[in-house]
């Protein structure tokens, strides 16, 4: 008997209950949904007609999750100005380079110290380096920090990470899977990623007058269909040229942010962002096998500590180089500390290449801890800054009059 709709309905009821509980105790919804996903899924018991394994509906739930990432990044793009990002181009390039160098170097060092082979070390370093754009976007929106002075640099670092990821995956997949053209593929990936982003920046500067006319649609029904058609087409096309679909959504949001319809788009997108965003974190939890985590506990805990320290240092250095205050700079590293879907993808590449089986449970546990801990660290960034300020005696600096979370 086909219970597909009932399975999806059951999943939504569980997500709703977890969301209500998180809201009641004024806690981030993200860890609740991830843990909920882990407790059910393929390893959960089947109780009569209530099937908590969600095997039949897994592809639909996973697709809901992918949509969540798109809406989260699209909304984040709507919150920014391309003009400001272009003006911050140098600081973004410098900040992104600093962030990648510090975290990737620490990952390499940790891999060698813990006894992995060269190729396994490259995989482990990749797992540790790439942050979760979906979680970062969700946290920035939830804590109302999109107007903060450091958020433009955070957004830039996320985009810079995508360029690094394209190059990294091309090179490492060539080394592990035996692709002899890995160097050429890496160079092509760089050119495509840079060119694609540049195209959207140009569009955001030149096309708003045309877009204002095209989007001058009175009917909300037709308007939202047009916006969603553009969103999914651009995201899907981005994937075909090996740029993350989430980055495509972010870039489209940046273009629409320059139009006079940006507020209307935001208003209509918010419910979809919240619903599908919740489904992303639930589906992410479903992908984690809780019974495989024990063998990598200490390895993951060490990596978590290293990541938090590395992120904080990288954020401070990048922020200060960009002229931000100590407080804003500390927020950078404490905001992009979460790890997620990209780390799992990197680990799976290593498994596909026949590397150590420990990589998968390590990545799962590492991501789980930081996906839960990351939003908490971001939320408590003010307290963390005050504590560190007592130790390092940073001079208090006055930020521009923007709302800080």
Curated annotation (Swiss-Prot):
Q: Which Gene3D superfamilies match?
A: 1.20.1530.20
Please report the record's description of how this protein sits within the membrane.
Multi-pass membrane protein
The keyword Transmembrane appears for this protein: yes
Q: Does the keyword Transmembrane apply?
A: yes
Q: What are this entry's molecular-function GO terms?
A: antiporter activity
The highest taxon in the source lineage is Bacteria
Query: Which keywords does this Swiss-Prot/TrEMBL entry list?
Result: Antiport, Cell membrane, Ion transport, Membrane, Potassium, Potassium transport, Transmembrane, Transmembrane helix, Transport
Inhibition and activation profile:
Potassium antiport activity requires the presence of KhtT. Activity is also modulated by KhtS. Has higher activity at alkaline pH.
Q: What induces it?
A: Part of the khtSTU operon. Induced by salt stress at alkaline pH.
Its predominant location is membrane
Name the GO cellular-component terms.
plasma membrane
The record's statement on gene disruption is: Deletion mutant is more sensitive to methylglyoxal than wild-type.
Record localization: Cell membrane
Q: Where are the transmembrane segments?
A: 3-23, 29-49, 60-80, 85-105, 108-128, 153-173, 183-203, 222-242, 268-288, 297-317, 332-352, 357-377
Give me any GO biological process, just one: proton transmembrane transport
Q: What does this protein do?
A: Potassium/proton antiporter that mediates the efflux of potassium ions from the cell. Can also mediate rubidium/proton antiport, but has no permeability for sodium or lithium ions. In the absence of KhtT, does not have antiport activity, but can catalyze potassium efflux. Involved in protection of the cell from methylglyoxal, a toxic by-product of glycolysis, via activation by S-lactoyl-BSH of the antiporter activity, leading to cytoplasmic acidification and methylglyoxal resistance.
Q: What binding partners and quaternary form does the record give?
A: The transporter is composed of the integral membrane protein KhtU and the regulatory protein KhtT.
Q: Which family does it belong to?
A: Belongs to the monovalent cation:proton antiporter 2 (CPA2) transporter (TC 2.A.37) family.
- What this protein is called in its record is K(+)/H(+) antiporter subunit KhtU
Q: What is the lineage of its organism?
A: Bacteria, Bacillati, Bacillota, Bacilli, Bacillales
Give the gene symbol. Answer: khtU
């Amino acid at each position: 008997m086909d219970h597909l709709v009932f399975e999806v309905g059951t999943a939504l009821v569980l997500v709703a209950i977890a969301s209500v509980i998180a809201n009641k105790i004024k806690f981030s919804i993200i860890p609740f949904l991830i843990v909920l996903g882990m407790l059910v899924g393929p390893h959960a018991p089947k109780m009569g007609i209530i099937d908590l394994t969600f095997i039949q509906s897994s592809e639909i739930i996973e697709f809901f999750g992918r949509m969540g990432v798109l809406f989260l990044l699209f909304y984040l793009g709507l919150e920014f100005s391309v003009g400001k990002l272009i003006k911050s181009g140098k600081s973004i390039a410098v900040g992104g380079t600093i962030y990648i160098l510090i975290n990737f170097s620490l990952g390499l060092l940790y891999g060698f110290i813990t006894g992995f082979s060269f190729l396994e070390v490259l995989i482990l370093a990749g797992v540790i380096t790439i942050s979760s754009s979906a979680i970062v976007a969700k946290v920035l929106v939830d804590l109302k920090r999109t107007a903060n002075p450091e958020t433009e640099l955070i957004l830039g670092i996320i985009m810079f990470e995508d360029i690094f990821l394209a190059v990294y995956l091309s090179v490492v997949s060539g080394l592990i899977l035996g692709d002899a053209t890995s160097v050429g593929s890496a160079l092509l990936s760089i050119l495509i990623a840079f060119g694609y982003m540049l195209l959207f920046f140009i569009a955001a500067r030149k096309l708003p007058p045309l877009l204002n006319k095209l989007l001058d649609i009175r009917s909300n029904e037709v308007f939202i269909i047009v916006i969603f058609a553009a969103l999914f087409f651009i995201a899907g096309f981005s994937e075909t040229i090996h740029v993350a679909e989430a980055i495509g959504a972010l870039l489209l949001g940046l273009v629409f942010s320059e139009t006079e319809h940006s507020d209307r788009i935001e208003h209509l997108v918010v419910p979809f962002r919240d619903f599908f965003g919740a489904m992303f974190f639930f589906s992410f939890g479903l992908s984690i096998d809780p019974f495989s985590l024990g063998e990598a506990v200490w390895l993951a805990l060490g990596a978590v500590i290293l990541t938090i320290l590395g992120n904080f240092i990288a954020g401070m250095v990048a922020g200060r180089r960009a002229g931000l205050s100590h407080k804003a700079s500390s927020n950078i590293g404490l905001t992009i500390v979460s790890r997620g879907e990209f780390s799992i993808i990197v680990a799976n590449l290593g498994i596909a290449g026949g590397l150590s089986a420990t990589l998968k449970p390590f990545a799962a546990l590492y991501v789980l801890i930081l996906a839960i801990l990351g939003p908490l660290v971001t939320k408590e960034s003010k307290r963390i800054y005050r504590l560190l300020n007592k130790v390092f005696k940073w001079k208090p600096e006055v930020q521009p009059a923007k709302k800080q979370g």
